[in-house]
């Protein structure tokens, strides 16, 4: 007899529900959120399980890989789709969610999410940690600027040379702020040191990967953006066409159509926020800093004059994502093109 299993995963315990082909509940219970414990329970209560489903979440990637290694037919369900189905239930509880997931898995009304490989997940963790250090360093610098401004010491936004050296030059040895700022600068120094170590690891990863090096041939795309794209997409063949990458990364506008109304709104901002941010930065660098002519830059410049800088950057970021996917799948590098004669 074929069974379908729904797992509602939480940090300590996982609610489990097993149903048969007709939707009849065969078992409901809980088990520790441990792959071994869950596998033993499933083998006992659902030995002929055809599919085992759970939602995307913080533990989903780890649990999916571990249960796959054990040989279980697990699927990871898009949490947004699952929420839309589960929210119609009157009572919200872990057993009810597990029951709803089991029913979704049985009837097939779900969208399966592709789980990143272990290698891509590790690189993703490295990039997230680096981004956090960059954010902390920026927050520390802004806090120091704010403290200096309160006593009339204006610190320029753009500086040359080490930040800590410039701050120390502004403060006299006996200034009341010097011991206060010193603590922040000490933390800033440590954060900067750790960020440099992460940067070195990022460069080493990019240098060792031929695909990442080719992605870096696109103007505006540096080491971090190329590596983030490489390990966020993970497998380019899962996209039917390069055009769908923009939608996957939340760079396409939402559409609302009902009756006589039909209009496009702002971009959806679904997908990976970190990579989307890096693509925006790449678009900005291409439009404002890259000196060499390219067909992409010329197109973006014309678009910027017509719709404004903000919308143009979104369009260029989306175009860069499409180009990166094409470069990856075709095994080519960026084609700068040739200026057309007037």
Which residues does each predicted region cover?
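A detector of single, family-specific signature residues
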Residues: 1-342
């Amino acid at each position: 007899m074929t069974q379908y299993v729904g797992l509602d995963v939480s940090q300590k315990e996982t609610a489990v529900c097993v149903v048969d082909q007709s939707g009849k509940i065969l078992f409901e219970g809980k088990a520790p959120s441990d792959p071994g414990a869950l596998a033993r329970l499933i083998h006992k209560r659902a030995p002929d399980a055809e599919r085992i489903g759970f939602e995307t979440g913080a533990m989903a990637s780890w649990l999916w890989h571990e249960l796959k290694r054990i040989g279980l037919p697990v699927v990871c369900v898009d949490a947004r789709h699952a929420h839309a189905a589960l929210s119609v239930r009157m009572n919200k509880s872990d057993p009810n969610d597990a029951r709803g997931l089991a029913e979704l898995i049985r009837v097939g009304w779900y969208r399966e999410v592709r789980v990143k490989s272990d290698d891509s997940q590790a690189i993703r963790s490295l990039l997230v940690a680096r981004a956090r250090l960059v954010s902390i360093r920026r927050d520390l610098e802004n806090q120091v600027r704010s403290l200096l401004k309160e006593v009339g010491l204006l610190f320029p936004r753009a500086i040359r040379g080490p930040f800590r050296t410039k701050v120390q030059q502004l403060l006299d040895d006996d200034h009341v702020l010097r011991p206060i700022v010193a603590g922040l600068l000490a933390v800033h120094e440590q954060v900067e040191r750790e960020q440099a170590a992460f940067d070195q690891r990022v460069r080493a990863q990019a240098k060792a990967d031929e695909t990442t090096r080719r992605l870096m041939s696109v103007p505006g795309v540096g080491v971090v953006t190329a590596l983030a794209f490489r390990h966020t997409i993970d497998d380019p063949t899962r996209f039917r066409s390069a055009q769908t990458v923009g939608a996957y990364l939340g760079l396409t506008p939402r559409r609302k159509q009902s009756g006589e109304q039909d209009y496009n709104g702002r971009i959806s901002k679904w997908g990976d926020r970190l990579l989307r941010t890096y693509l925006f930065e790449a678009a900005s660098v291409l439009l404002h800093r890259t000196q060499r002519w390219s067909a992409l830059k010329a197109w973006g410049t014309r678009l910027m004059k017509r719709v404004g800088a903000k919308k143009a950057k979104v369009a260029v970021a989306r175009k860069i994502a499409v180009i990166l996917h094409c470069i990856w799948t075709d095994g080519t590098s960026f084609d700068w093109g040739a200026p057309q004669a007037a």
